[in-house]
């Protein structure tokens, strides 16, 4: 496993639509392992492949209940609404108010290329929506209500 460089706002790769994964090769397995290591090292709860410069439809998420690896994910159901502060490893030191669904159901492939579904509420729902936006070339700052504000590492540890 290796740490990968996280691309930041302004990098053209973050504005591109990612390609579907058709098979899990050793390179894809290494990418997933590297993404998890990079996410944990950066104290993030989610990371999408384009954030490390790879235009593949892969996200990793861990909101405190263990890692979730999603290949070719899509949201198939959503409900409710939540508004809260959101940040991004690709927009360091900033956060802003974003409204997202309070509940989502997503379908995805696992590393075994079998199909799975996951249901999430609150933080997990927010994270799934946020990471899937990356796969279509969108950053959360496009959805911010009001202005971005500065955050420090200490703010994120509360």
UniProtKB/Swiss-Prot annotation:
Give the record's keywords alphabetically.
Hydrolase, Iron, Metal-binding, Protein biosynthesis
Enzyme Commission no:
3.5.1.88
Q: Kindly list the cofactors needed.
A: Fe(2+)
Please list the reactions this protein catalyses: N-terminal N-formyl-L-methionyl-[peptide] + H2O = N-terminal L-methionyl-[peptide] + formate
InterPro entries assigned to the protein according to its UniProt record, in alphabetical order: Peptide_deformylase (IPR023635), Peptide_deformylase_sf (IPR036821)
Q: Does the entry feature the keyword Hydrolase, yes or no? A: yes
> What Pfam family is a match, any one?
Pep_deformylase
Q: Which HAMAP family match?
A: Pep_deformylase
**Family label:** Belongs to the polypeptide deformylase family.
What is the designated name of this protein? Peptide deformylase
State the organism of origin: Agathobacter rectalis (strain ATCC 33656 / DSM 3377 / JCM 17463 / KCTC 5835 / VPI 0990)
Name the gene that codes for it.
def
């Amino acid at each position: 496993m290796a740490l990968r460089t996280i691309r930041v706002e302004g990098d053209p790769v973050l504005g591109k639509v990612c390609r579907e994964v058709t098979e899990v090769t050793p390179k894809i397995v290494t990418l997933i392992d590297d993404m998890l290591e990079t996410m944990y090292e950066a104290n993030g709860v989610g990371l999408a492949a384009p954030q490390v410069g790879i235009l593949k439809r892969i996200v990793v998420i861990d909101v405190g209940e263990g890692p979730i690896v999603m290949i070719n994910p899509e949201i198939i159901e959503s409900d409710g609404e939540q508004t809260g502060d959101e940040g991004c490893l690709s927009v360091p030191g900033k956060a802003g108010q974003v409204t997202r669904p309070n509940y989502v159901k997503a379908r995805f492939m696992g590393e075994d290329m079998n199909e799975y579904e996951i249901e999430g509420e609150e933080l997990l729902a927010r994270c799934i929506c946020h990471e899937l936006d990356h796969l279509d070339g969108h950053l959360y700052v496009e959805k911010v209500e009001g202005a971005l504000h500065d955050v420090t590492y200490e703010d994120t540890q509360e």
